[in-house]
């Protein structure tokens, strides 16, 4: 540890102690908050089922930066490189299309054995795993419908895929000793004016009930459902709307997924957390950065990311909110994208933990909104960066932008050879 870092740390401890904050306790609490990194940043959501196939479901990864992962070994190597540069606890979020098999496997036939390598890798790296059925980029999703499809045969295929995915998820939780959160998102919707908005939702309701009918150990598996305002090709009608899934999660007591890019541009999920928590047992967050639409840009340390983190910390939702990331940018180094976004999420959590929330609550309750605003703004100038640097030091990760040199070296020695 350098003398400069030690001095900055000691000064930061004093400054935060003056406003009633124990920085050591803040770092202990930060280690209670894993962030689930999404596997699909490394290969632009291609997966291993049909890597050359088209990406459908209204999903777009724009850009053509060299070095995308082409197989599971490359993806795991990229993840390891990124994780070495991110301090604190992490998880990995997998989609079903990232299975490994020597022969083609129909999505309704996926089994735990197809993800055995991921589990062994997670054990070796002390990670938890989360999961998602992949209801897109498939011939049976080509017309824009899956679990709400009017064709019984096609709808049953997707029901069976989600059922099989739940068993994979439970396998993750059983093997790793931490529950896997399995999130169901479907692209179902219509491009133009829709006459019958009810029937697809009735079918989706029945389909979801069948999907979750098998009782699984909640210590191993958690069901979550995710809404979306619209998607490309589904601009006029989305079957799985916010109202639909809030009602479903409330009535079935599943987790509800809130994606930062899945609402109107004037809405923010930070404002939805406290409302939804009154009705659902758990929340899954997909922290992203929508630019005019659900563009899934790399997460910044911006106002909304900070507000999301503050909601979790202020209301002590550590055990009820699962923090996941969902962005994919193919225009920049993909490992750097992971590192930037995940470090920013963790920085936001740390800043929230360094807030004098008890004092702010007192001011708010007393109606002293002047002091509340003043204290909130002055808090931004306190030396949280020194606390972050100590956290990185303790987790043997770079504290500042020097991590970029590691990424550049990896790009030169590994990524550049992929073509």
From Swiss-Prot:
GO terms for cellular component: cytoplasm. Keywords: Cytoplasm, Isomerase, Manganese, Metal-binding, Rhamnose metabolism. GO terms for molecular function: L-rhamnose isomerase activity; manganese ion binding. It is found in: Cytoplasm. Pathway: Carbohydrate degradation; L-rhamnose degradation; glycerone phosphate from L-rhamnose: step 1/3. It comes from the Bacteria. Mn(2+) binds at residues 262, 294, 296. It holds the Pfam family RhaA. Binds 1 Mn(2+) ion per subunit. Homotetramer. Catalyzes the interconversion of L-rhamnose and L-rhamnulose. This is L-rhamnose isomerase. The gene is rhaA.
